[in-house]
Amino acid sequence: MAQAKEVRGPGPRMGGPRPKVENPGKLLKRIMDEVFRHYLPHCILVLVCIVVSALANVQASLFLKTLMDDYIVPMTQQQDPDFAPLAAALLRVGIIYVIGILAAWGNARIMVNVTQGTLRNLRTQLFTHMESLPIKYFDQHPHGDIMSVYTNDVDTLRQMLSQSIPQLVSSAITIVSVFFSMCMLSWQLTIVTMLMVALMMFCSKKITQQSGKYFIQQQRDLGKLNGYIEEMMEGQKVVKVFTHEQKALAGFRQLNDQLKDSANKANSFANIMMPVNAQLGNISYAVCALAGAAMAVSGMGGTTLGTVVAFLSLNKGFNMPISQVSMQANSIIMALAGAERIFKMMDEESETDEGYVTLVNAKYDRNDQLVETDERTGLWAWKHPHHDGTTTYHKLEGSITFTDVDFGYVPEKTVLHDINLYGLPGQKIAFVGSTGAGKTTITNLINRFYDIQDGKIRYDGINIHKIKKADLRRSLGIVLQDTHLFTGTVMENIRYGRLDATDEECIAAARLANADGFIKRLPEGYNTMLTGDGANLSQGQRQLLAIARAAVADPPVLILDEATSSIDTRTEALVQRGMDGLMYGRTSFVIAHRLSTVRNADCIVVLEQGRIIERGSHDELIAKKGKYYQLYTGNLAEN
């Protein structure tokens, strides 16, 4: 099949220049909007808890001045001190601390609920949006990179929401309340403290600037590594067949080393921040202690021993939030890098659908008029609303026509040229040609995985752009080139073709596809669990289940994309008999490597480099001795 994506060999993908987070403020606002949309009352309660906890800590520090000046110092001057007032004072301090602890505990418990709920909502939105994305998005993005958004990037938000943002808010409230408290105790010592804080902030800014860019690169490198691992897991058989284990390992090591380097640089800068700030905080504490002691001894500004003790406690409480702000800044930067990837995926344009013609169950009334019904009658009709408010119903026949169709996966490169063909109800149309001729591309246009650039495709005379995509695809039974089975029972995988199908209908579909025989030989029959994309089945058995899945949908049009290319000759004969019964009365578009499977086609279309070069029945094309004759006889050297 012609593809619009870049074809690359199995190996590491080298990145370009180091990425930067665009509009971090806008990203943070978008995250918080998501939180507030569902958890605003919880966030208000968290804020109350943070304020109570911060004020409790400040009040406890201020109480030290009263404790020293009014209780402890006077008691040292008494021969027979009374400890009862001191005990009462200590009890009050203890109550203050308990209130602070309870508030901090409440804050943590509520934030766990808010964080996990927000992440659940984000994952749901991501998956919902992913389901609406066009096929070309998945053709152009490595699946491992998409998985990394769900896992690594979402997890970075968990740390930011549960720890970083609450600590930043707590630190901000603590800094403000402690600052005013320090000013009340001693403006001179406050100036000394602020000078040291300015130095801490300067150092933190420099460190954050260096670590931030490496945290962003770390997230990108992690996504690349995940994508490579998934690619190698899916292609493990190919790797082993061509004995490329060492090449695969070399590619992994390169990406793994790339991740190690960016993670080392990011965490090296981040890890030195705490020790640097801690040492600067200790210096600030020591300088304030010396200055405070000198002021207390000289009596400057009415400074007492209690003032110095309380101020030193506040000094510690002031430096710690400053250090936390610096450390959490790195976590937030890393989370914003993940958020950028999350919202980039969520902002991808959904698959557009301007269709208004729908597919409905129908029946004939007493006047022999086609009318809509809720019952499954086996008769389908196109429901066509008109501008004048009227609605007409047209029986679904299964006629598909291509008229002057041009298409390219990218606008500047056309891969299908001037395609004209038709499939009448009940006809079997076969596409043959060399690899890359455009056979599968045509089937992708029928189900509108991609839209044409020029020309028209009509379904029962209706332009398929007027038909809603879901209804269009519901009328098509498709057996894809790569058979995909889901984790679940055999019965559930067959029922995937029509979710309301009964067990009896699923079994009948399996019999029609000649899959019933091997299914009954499975350990649990139709209740046998399939895992790992049906890894416990042979390729032929998986193909048979895919055909049964299409059969249970009972569609008027079938698309069989190389459905029997991976099945042995004996199994192919079984499938072919089942498919002949399934295709009877249905318009069928078939692609097959084995031309013997399409000899009975009503029309064989020969494609070469995106153009139709021959068409006709098997006998007609053999008589022409053209391209089809060469393909059928293997005489490709002729002409």
Place the predicted regions along the sequence by residue.
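Membrane-integrated ABC transporters
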Residues: M1-N57, I72-V93, N107-M111, T115, ...
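Short intracellular "coupling" helices and adjacent cytoplasmic loop segments at the cytosolic face
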Residues: P12-P19, Q116, T124-S148, N152-V154, ...
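Juxtamembrane helix-loop junctions of ABC transporter transmembrane domains
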Residues: P17-G25, V48-C49, A56-I72, I96-H143, ...
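An intracellular "coupling" helix at the cytosolic face of ABC transporter transmembrane type-1 domains
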Residues: R37-L40, I135-K136, V154-L161, I165, ...
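Transmembrane helices of ABC transporter permease
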Residues: H38, H42-L55, I96, L102, ...
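Hydrophobic alpha-helical transmembrane bundles that constitute the permease/transmembrane domains
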Residues: V51-Q59, G94-W105, L157-M160, S164-V176, ...
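Helix-loop-helix
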Residues: P74, S181-L195, K265, F269-E340, ...
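ABC-type nucleotide-binding domain
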Residues: Q79, A362-N639
